[in-house]
Amino acid sequence: MSGPSPHQPSPWQPDLLALIPSPSPARASAAPADQQPDLPAAAPSAPAQAAPGPRRAPATLLILDTETTGLDPARGRCIEVGAILFAVAERAVLAQVSFLLPTDANPAEHVNGIAAAVTRLPQPWQAGLRFFVAMLEAAEAVLAHNAAFDRQWFGIDPLPPVRKPWICSMDDIRWPAHLCLKTSPSVRDLALAHGVPVWAAHRALSDCTYLAQVLERCTDLDTLLVAALEPRQLFRARLSYAERQKARDAGFRWNDPVPGAWTRRLTEAEAGALPFPVERVEPQAGGVTQTTAACGAAAA
Protein backbone atom coordinates (compact mmCIF):
# COMPACT_ATOMS: atom_id res chain seq x y z
CA MET A 1 0.00 0.00 0.00
CA SER A 2 1.25 3.47 -0.75
CA GLY A 3 2.69 5.81 1.85
CA PRO A 4 0.71 8.55 3.55
CA SER A 5 -0.14 11.85 1.95
CA PRO A 6 -0.17 15.15 3.88
CA HIS A 7 -3.45 15.88 5.59
CA GLN A 8 -4.98 19.29 6.13
CA PRO A 9 -6.56 19.91 9.54
CA SER A 10 -10.32 19.32 9.48
CA PRO A 11 -12.45 22.35 10.32
CA TRP A 12 -14.25 20.43 13.07
CA GLN A 13 -11.18 19.79 15.15
CA PRO A 14 -11.04 23.15 16.96
CA ASP A 15 -14.71 22.78 17.94
CA LEU A 16 -14.17 19.26 19.31
CA LEU A 17 -11.13 20.28 21.30
CA ALA A 18 -13.03 23.26 22.60
CA LEU A 19 -15.34 20.78 24.33
CA ILE A 20 -12.43 19.48 26.42
CA PRO A 21 -12.18 21.29 29.79
CA SER A 22 -9.12 23.50 30.12
CA PRO A 23 -6.49 22.22 32.54
CA SER A 24 -6.40 23.75 36.00
CA PRO A 25 -3.62 26.28 36.72
CA ALA A 26 -1.83 23.70 38.84
CA ARG A 27 -1.56 21.38 35.88
CA ALA A 28 -0.85 24.03 33.29
CA SER A 29 2.63 24.70 34.57
CA ALA A 30 5.43 22.94 32.69
CA ALA A 31 3.77 19.56 32.21
CA PRO A 32 6.09 17.18 30.35
CA ALA A 33 5.10 16.35 26.77
CA ASP A 34 4.59 12.69 27.60
CA GLN A 35 2.54 13.23 30.76
CA GLN A 36 -0.44 10.91 30.90
CA PRO A 37 -3.79 12.75 31.13
CA ASP A 38 -6.28 11.97 33.86
CA LEU A 39 -8.60 9.31 32.49
CA PRO A 40 -12.04 8.35 33.80
CA ALA A 41 -12.02 5.50 36.28
CA ALA A 42 -12.79 2.14 34.72
CA ALA A 43 -16.35 1.01 35.23
CA PRO A 44 -16.75 -1.95 37.61
CA SER A 45 -17.19 -5.32 36.03
CA ALA A 46 -20.80 -6.24 35.40
CA PRO A 47 -22.16 -9.08 37.56
CA ALA A 48 -22.75 -12.46 36.01
CA GLN A 49 -26.06 -12.58 34.16
CA ALA A 50 -28.44 -15.24 33.01
CA ALA A 51 -28.26 -16.67 29.52
CA PRO A 52 -28.51 -13.78 27.03
CA GLY A 53 -31.36 -13.44 24.58
CA PRO A 54 -30.99 -13.15 20.82
CA ARG A 55 -28.04 -11.07 19.72
CA ARG A 56 -28.58 -7.68 18.15
CA ALA A 57 -26.24 -5.47 16.23
CA PRO A 58 -24.48 -2.77 18.26
CA ALA A 59 -26.10 0.64 17.92
CA THR A 60 -22.74 2.40 17.86
CA LEU A 61 -19.27 1.30 16.80
CA LEU A 62 -15.91 2.81 17.58
CA ILE A 63 -13.87 2.24 14.44
CA LEU A 64 -10.23 2.50 15.44
CA ASP A 65 -6.74 2.03 14.05
CA THR A 66 -3.23 2.40 15.42
CA GLU A 67 0.19 3.10 14.01
CA THR A 68 3.13 1.71 15.95
CA THR A 69 6.91 1.56 16.01
CA GLY A 70 6.91 -2.23 15.66
CA LEU A 71 4.86 -5.41 15.81
CA ASP A 72 5.54 -6.40 19.43
CA PRO A 73 4.24 -4.24 22.33
CA ALA A 74 7.12 -5.53 24.45
CA ARG A 75 9.59 -3.79 22.12
CA GLY A 76 7.58 -1.07 20.38
CA ARG A 77 4.93 1.47 21.24
CA CYS A 78 1.81 2.99 19.75
CA ILE A 79 2.51 6.39 18.20
CA GLU A 80 -0.83 7.23 16.56
CA VAL A 81 -4.49 6.54 17.25
CA GLY A 82 -7.36 7.28 14.90
CA ALA A 83 -11.01 6.65 15.74
CA ILE A 84 -14.50 7.27 14.35
CA LEU A 85 -17.73 6.93 16.34
CA PHE A 86 -20.24 5.40 13.94
CA ALA A 87 -24.04 5.08 14.26
CA VAL A 88 -25.01 1.73 12.73
CA ALA A 89 -28.72 2.22 11.96
CA GLU A 90 -28.18 5.69 10.50
CA ARG A 91 -24.91 4.74 8.72
CA ALA A 92 -23.52 8.02 10.04
CA VAL A 93 -20.23 9.31 11.42
CA LEU A 94 -20.88 10.95 14.80
CA ALA A 95 -17.37 12.03 15.80
CA GLN A 96 -13.76 11.40 14.92
CA VAL A 97 -10.33 12.04 16.36
CA SER A 98 -6.67 11.43 15.53
CA PHE A 99 -3.57 12.21 17.54
CA LEU A 100 0.13 11.35 17.69
CA LEU A 101 1.85 10.04 20.81
CA PRO A 102 5.40 11.32 21.43
CA THR A 103 8.24 8.88 20.83
CA ASP A 104 12.02 9.07 20.71
CA ALA A 105 12.41 6.77 17.70
CA ASN A 106 10.26 5.08 15.05
CA PRO A 107 11.90 2.09 13.35
CA ALA A 108 8.69 1.65 11.32
CA GLU A 109 8.85 5.10 9.70
CA HIS A 110 9.32 3.43 6.31
CA VAL A 111 5.90 1.78 6.81
CA ASN A 112 3.75 4.52 8.34
CA GLY A 113 5.70 7.60 7.27
CA ILE A 114 5.63 9.12 10.76
CA ALA A 115 8.92 10.74 11.74
CA ALA A 116 9.72 10.52 15.44
CA ALA A 117 10.54 14.24 15.48
CA VAL A 118 7.03 15.02 14.24
CA THR A 119 5.45 13.15 17.16
CA ARG A 120 7.33 15.44 19.55
CA LEU A 121 6.06 18.69 18.03
CA PRO A 122 3.71 20.66 20.32
CA GLN A 123 0.15 19.34 19.92
CA PRO A 124 -2.72 18.60 22.34
CA TRP A 125 -2.44 14.81 22.33
CA GLN A 126 -3.63 14.60 25.93
CA ALA A 127 -6.88 16.32 24.96
CA GLY A 128 -7.19 13.99 21.98
CA LEU A 129 -6.75 10.99 24.26
CA ARG A 130 -9.44 12.25 26.64
CA PHE A 131 -11.82 12.70 23.72
CA PHE A 132 -10.98 9.19 22.50
CA VAL A 133 -11.91 7.80 25.93
CA ALA A 134 -15.24 9.64 25.76
CA MET A 135 -15.91 8.17 22.31
CA LEU A 136 -15.02 4.71 23.60
CA GLU A 137 -17.52 5.06 26.43
CA ALA A 138 -20.23 6.03 23.92
CA ALA A 139 -19.66 2.95 21.73
CA GLU A 140 -21.23 -0.48 22.22
CA ALA A 141 -18.49 -2.31 20.33
CA VAL A 142 -15.09 -1.66 18.76
CA LEU A 143 -14.29 -2.44 15.13
CA ALA A 144 -10.76 -2.66 13.74
CA HIS A 145 -9.07 -4.19 10.73
CA ASN A 146 -6.76 -6.88 12.09
CA ALA A 147 -8.17 -6.30 15.57
CA ALA A 148 -5.78 -8.83 17.13
CA PHE A 149 -2.94 -6.44 16.34
CA ASP A 150 -4.61 -3.20 17.45
CA ARG A 151 -6.13 -4.46 20.71
CA GLN A 152 -2.76 -5.54 22.15
CA TRP A 153 -1.63 -1.91 22.48
CA PHE A 154 -4.54 -0.86 24.70
CA GLY A 155 -4.02 -1.04 28.42
CA ILE A 156 -0.38 -0.02 27.91
CA ASP A 157 0.42 3.48 29.17
CA PRO A 158 -0.90 5.93 28.10
CA LEU A 159 -3.70 4.09 26.25
CA PRO A 160 -6.68 2.90 28.30
CA PRO A 161 -7.85 -0.73 28.36
CA VAL A 162 -10.74 -1.57 26.04
CA ARG A 163 -13.42 -3.73 27.64
CA LYS A 164 -15.98 -3.49 24.84
CA PRO A 165 -16.58 -6.36 22.39
CA TRP A 166 -14.14 -6.34 19.47
CA ILE A 167 -15.08 -6.99 15.85
CA CYS A 168 -12.38 -7.64 13.27
CA SER A 169 -13.35 -6.44 9.79
CA MET A 170 -10.63 -8.67 8.36
CA ASP A 171 -11.39 -11.98 10.11
CA ASP A 172 -14.78 -11.80 11.87
CA ILE A 173 -17.03 -10.32 9.17
CA ARG A 174 -18.02 -12.68 6.38
CA TRP A 175 -18.21 -10.28 3.46
CA PRO A 176 -20.67 -11.16 0.66
CA ALA A 177 -19.34 -13.56 -1.96
CA HIS A 178 -20.29 -11.27 -4.85
CA LEU A 179 -17.53 -8.87 -3.76
CA CYS A 180 -14.95 -11.52 -4.76
CA LEU A 181 -12.71 -10.70 -1.79
CA LYS A 182 -10.00 -12.83 -0.26
CA THR A 183 -10.91 -14.57 2.98
CA SER A 184 -8.93 -11.97 4.95
CA PRO A 185 -9.02 -8.87 2.73
CA SER A 186 -6.84 -5.81 3.17
CA VAL A 187 -8.39 -2.43 3.95
CA ARG A 188 -7.51 -1.34 0.42
CA ASP A 189 -9.23 -4.31 -1.23
CA LEU A 190 -12.25 -3.97 1.03
CA ALA A 191 -12.61 -0.28 0.18
CA LEU A 192 -12.20 -0.75 -3.56
CA ALA A 193 -14.72 -3.61 -3.59
CA HIS A 194 -17.29 -1.20 -2.12
CA GLY A 195 -16.48 1.61 -4.55
CA VAL A 196 -14.52 3.64 -2.00
CA PRO A 197 -11.55 5.48 -3.55
CA VAL A 198 -8.22 4.88 -1.83
CA TRP A 199 -5.89 7.87 -1.66
CA ALA A 200 -3.58 7.06 1.26
CA ALA A 201 -2.66 4.22 3.57
CA HIS A 202 -0.89 3.48 6.83
CA ARG A 203 -2.20 6.49 8.72
CA ALA A 204 -4.69 5.70 11.44
CA LEU A 205 -7.56 8.05 10.62
CA SER A 206 -7.45 7.43 6.86
CA ASP A 207 -7.87 3.68 7.41
CA CYS A 208 -10.78 4.38 9.80
CA THR A 209 -12.37 6.59 7.13
CA TYR A 210 -12.18 3.77 4.57
CA LEU A 211 -13.88 1.38 7.00
CA ALA A 212 -16.61 3.90 7.81
CA GLN A 213 -17.25 4.39 4.10
CA VAL A 214 -17.47 0.62 3.65
CA LEU A 215 -20.00 0.29 6.48
CA GLU A 216 -22.08 3.12 5.02
CA ARG A 217 -22.46 1.09 1.82
CA CYS A 218 -23.48 -2.20 3.52
CA THR A 219 -27.17 -2.93 3.02
CA ASP A 220 -27.07 -5.90 5.42
CA LEU A 221 -24.74 -4.39 8.03
CA ASP A 222 -26.81 -5.49 11.04
CA THR A 223 -26.70 -9.12 9.91
CA LEU A 224 -22.95 -8.98 9.29
CA LEU A 225 -22.27 -7.47 12.72
CA VAL A 226 -24.46 -9.94 14.60
CA ALA A 227 -22.68 -12.84 12.91
CA ALA A 228 -19.30 -11.24 13.60
CA LEU A 229 -20.05 -11.17 17.33
CA GLU A 230 -20.60 -14.92 17.49
CA PRO A 231 -18.01 -16.61 19.74
CA ARG A 232 -14.99 -17.83 17.79
CA GLN A 233 -12.15 -20.17 18.58
CA LEU A 234 -8.88 -20.97 16.88
CA PHE A 235 -9.00 -24.19 14.84
CA ARG A 236 -6.18 -26.13 13.23
CA ALA A 237 -6.70 -27.99 9.95
CA ARG A 238 -5.94 -31.71 10.07
CA LEU A 239 -4.62 -32.10 6.56
CA SER A 240 -1.58 -33.64 4.97
CA TYR A 241 1.00 -31.55 3.16
CA ALA A 242 -0.48 -32.68 -0.16
CA GLU A 243 -3.90 -31.37 0.94
CA ARG A 244 -2.69 -27.95 2.11
CA GLN A 245 -4.51 -26.12 -0.69
CA LYS A 246 -7.82 -27.05 0.95
CA ALA A 247 -6.80 -25.13 4.06
CA ARG A 248 -5.60 -22.15 2.03
CA ASP A 249 -8.85 -22.05 0.05
CA ALA A 250 -10.83 -22.08 3.32
CA GLY A 251 -8.97 -19.02 4.60
CA PHE A 252 -6.59 -20.78 6.98
CA ARG A 253 -3.19 -19.18 7.62
CA TRP A 254 0.08 -21.04 7.70
CA ASN A 255 2.39 -20.50 10.67
CA ASP A 256 0.22 -17.72 12.15
CA PRO A 257 -0.36 -17.76 15.06
CA VAL A 258 0.56 -21.45 15.54
CA PRO A 259 3.97 -22.39 14.10
CA GLY A 260 3.86 -25.20 11.56
CA ALA A 261 0.07 -25.30 11.30
CA TRP A 262 -2.84 -24.03 9.19
CA THR A 263 -5.20 -22.17 11.56
CA ARG A 264 -8.24 -19.91 11.48
CA ARG A 265 -10.70 -18.43 13.99
CA LEU A 266 -14.15 -19.93 13.39
CA THR A 267 -17.52 -20.38 15.05
CA GLU A 268 -18.53 -23.92 15.98
CA ALA A 269 -21.01 -23.95 13.08
CA GLU A 270 -18.36 -22.82 10.59
CA ALA A 271 -15.91 -25.44 11.83
CA GLY A 272 -18.51 -28.18 11.59
CA ALA A 273 -19.39 -27.23 8.02
CA LEU A 274 -15.83 -27.58 6.71
CA PRO A 275 -15.13 -30.36 4.18
CA PHE A 276 -12.06 -31.48 6.16
CA PRO A 277 -11.37 -32.21 9.84
CA VAL A 278 -10.14 -29.54 12.25
CA GLU A 279 -9.30 -29.39 15.95
CA ARG A 280 -9.53 -26.59 18.48
CA VAL A 281 -6.30 -24.95 19.56
CA GLU A 282 -6.06 -23.59 23.10
CA PRO A 283 -3.14 -21.28 23.95
CA GLN A 284 -1.18 -22.33 27.02
CA ALA A 285 1.48 -20.70 29.16
CA GLY A 286 4.89 -20.40 27.59
CA GLY A 287 3.53 -20.30 24.05
CA VAL A 288 2.58 -23.99 24.08
CA THR A 289 -0.68 -24.96 22.38
CA GLN A 290 -3.13 -27.67 23.34
CA THR A 291 -5.57 -29.28 20.93
CA THR A 292 -9.00 -30.70 21.72
CA ALA A 293 -11.59 -32.82 19.95
CA ALA A 294 -11.81 -32.63 16.20
CA CYS A 295 -14.82 -31.60 14.14
CA GLY A 296 -15.60 -31.01 10.49
CA ALA A 297 -16.97 -33.21 7.75
CA ALA A 298 -14.21 -35.81 7.93
CA ALA A 299 -13.86 -35.91 11.73
CA ALA A 300 -16.55 -38.48 12.39
Where are these regions (language model features)?
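Conserved beta-strand -> loop -> alpha-helix junction used to position metal-binding or nucleic-acid-contacting
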Residues: 162-176
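Catalytic phosphate/metal-binding cores of nucleic-acid and nucleotide-processing enzymes, i.e., regions
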Residues: 179
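Acidic two-metal-ion nuclease catalytic site recognized across multiple nuclease folds
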Residues: 2-53, 214-300
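Conserved non-catalytic scaffold segment of RNase H-like nuclease domains
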Residues: 11, 15-25, 29-164, 184-202
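Short Asp/Glu-rich motifs
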Residues: 128, 210-211, 266
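Acidic, divalent-metal-coordinating active-site segment for phosphoryl/phosphodiester hydrolysis
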Residues: 205-216
